[in-house]
Regions:
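Intrinsically disordered, low-complexity terminal regions
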Residues: 1-199
Length: 199
């Protein structure tokens, strides 16, 4: 059921992000940096174009910093619901809108991370060692999820639809399950006990 739920989530985000846009909103060049208070979360749901996310697993209190054009910032929402940090356009801009920010940098940290779902052309960098019993990563569109340090899991699930890439050169897990649809790539290094892929 978890696998099906994540597939529905990333495919749903992909459908939203891949609709033919009726309007394009370009960044106005007025770059602003905002620190947004957030409650505890262990899941990231990301949707948008041109977003670069830098995540760190840390014992420090949860934090979120957004750096982007003022007119882009005003059309996005940033909130935590049921331990899920959601970064996405406001409801009236989720369909038929193409965002072209001058810059869209997200810096986030939390104590735990169990699930990551990204849609659109989002580039997610995991910049610290990451540990979790179970971890689910979902990509829809042309995004990238990249682990820059050691990642250790008991169970790892990777699901990609579109032309996205998953990269991790120091991944250690007992069991790996991967689902790939489209012209995507999974690049892994490290040690895996059991691996199963559906292509």
């Amino acid at each position: 059921m978890k696998k099906i739920s994540l597939l529905f989530l990333i495919c749903g985000l992909f459908l939203v992000s891949s609709c033919i846009p009726t309007q394009t909103i370009k960044g106005d060049g007025n770059i602003t940096t905002e620190n947004i208070p957030v409650s505890e979360y262990d899941c990231l749901e990301l949707e948008g174009g041109g977003m670069v996310v830098n995540y760190t697993q840390s014992d420090a209190p949860e934090g979120l910093e957004i750096k982007t054009d003022r007119n882009i910032f005003e059309k996005y929402e940033f909130n935590v619901e049921n331990h899920k940090l959601k970064i996405r356009p406001k409801k009236e801009f989720r369909k038929h809108t193409n965002f072209r920010p001058t810059e869209f940098m997200v810096t986030a940290n939390s104590r735990n991370l169990k699930k990551l779902a990204a849609a659109g052309s989002t580039h997610v960098n995991i910049n610290s060692p990451l540990q979790a019993e179970e971890f689910e990563a979902g990509l829809a569109g042309s995004g990238i999820i990249q682990f820059h340090d050691t990642a250790s899991f008991t169970n790892l699930k990777i699901e990609i639809a579109g032309s996205g890439d998953f990269v991790g050169h120091k991944v250690y897990c007992e069991e790996l399950n991967g689902d790939m649809a489209g012209s995507n790539t999974i690049v892994l290094g490290g040690t895996v006990g059991i691996a199963e892929f559906s292509i």
